[in-house]
Each structure stands twice: as C-alpha cells, then as structure tokens.
C-alpha cells in the first residue's frame, strides 16, 4: 500500500510540476506550485520525515502563498490563459502523463525489477529508546538531524529562497 501511495504522490508531483512549468496564467501557475509543494511534503511524510515535512510545508508554502497573492494581484487578466488554450502544451502534458503511467505500471508489474538504494547513515535518523529515560523528543532529533546531516540542504534551501525573492523583485519591478 505504501508503494502505491508513493507512486500516486510522485505522479501528482510530476503533473503539478508540468502544470506550472508550462507557463499558463500566473493564477494557475501559482496553484501548481502550491499543489507541488504540498505533495512534496506528503512524499517526505510518507517516508517518515514528519518534522521535516511539516517545516517545509509551513515555510515553503507560507512564502509561496505570499508570492501567489502578489502575482495574482499584479497579473489579473479578464480571460486567463489555461492549459487547453495552447494545444502543444496540452498534448505534451498528456504525453508526459501517459509516459509516467506506463513507467509506473512497468515498475509495479515487473517481478524481476530490483531497486537498490543504499543509505549509509539512515540509522542515525531513527529515534531510539534509551531505556531508563524514555524516548527522545522527535522534534529535537529532527532539528539535530537537519543541521548535522542536512547542512547542505539548509544552505541550498536558503540560497534558493534568496534567488527566488530576487527574481520576483526583478520581475515585478517593471521598467
């Protein structure tokens, strides 16, 4: 069941990425970003990262809602462009979705397919029972793991947010 949930979430993630990268009206592009962010957090939650999924959901989607509100207010159109208005984008959207379904079906139905993932430090993310003092707090362990093993993730995320803000400021600045 968990495999099916992972495949469904991955398919929705790909569809939402195609949705906002096909550059429809900013209203629909922002909606695609919000859906992809929420589904990405669902994938993190599916693999057991409850604290990280919650933090990404709160920070990323909080920022995206602000950007979504600004782009909606600045680029309001009487007749917004949708995916159906451009036949090429719609056909590529359908073709990519069908390819994703075929690949997912092949991966599920093939008995000989073996996917090997090697996570060397995965045991460090597990919450252990210490015996006499009970369990460690999951939130504290999540923060410790984020800043010890995920230092590069924090740096890349911060840099991406700065670049995103600069791009939005440059686009909305005008002439």
From Swiss-Prot:
Its EC number is 7.1.1.2. It is an enzyme of class 7 (translocase). Keywords: Electron transport, Membrane, Mitochondrion, Mitochondrion inner membrane, NAD, Respiratory chain, Translocase, Transmembrane, Transmembrane helix, Transport. It catalyses: a ubiquinone + NADH + 5 H(+)(in) = a ubiquinol + NAD(+) + 4 H(+)(out). The chain crosses the membrane at residues 1-21, 25-45, 48-68, 88-108, 149-169. Pfam families: Oxidored_q3. It is found in: Mitochondrion inner membrane. The keyword Glycoprotein does not apply. The keyword Membrane applies. Its main location: mitochondrion. It is a multi-pass membrane protein. Gene3D superfamilies: NADH-ubiquinone/plastoquinone oxidoreductase chain 6, subunit NuoJ (1.20.120.1200). One of its GO terms (molecular function) is NADH dehydrogenase (ubiquinone) activity. One of its GO terms (biological process) is mitochondrial respiratory chain complex I assembly. Core subunit of the mitochondrial membrane respiratory chain NADH dehydrogenase (Complex I) which catalyzes electron transfer from NADH through the respiratory chain, using ubiquinone as an electron acceptor. Essential for the catalytic activity and assembly of complex I. This is NADH-ubiquinone oxidoreductase chain 6. It comes from Urotrichus talpoides (Japanese shrew mole).
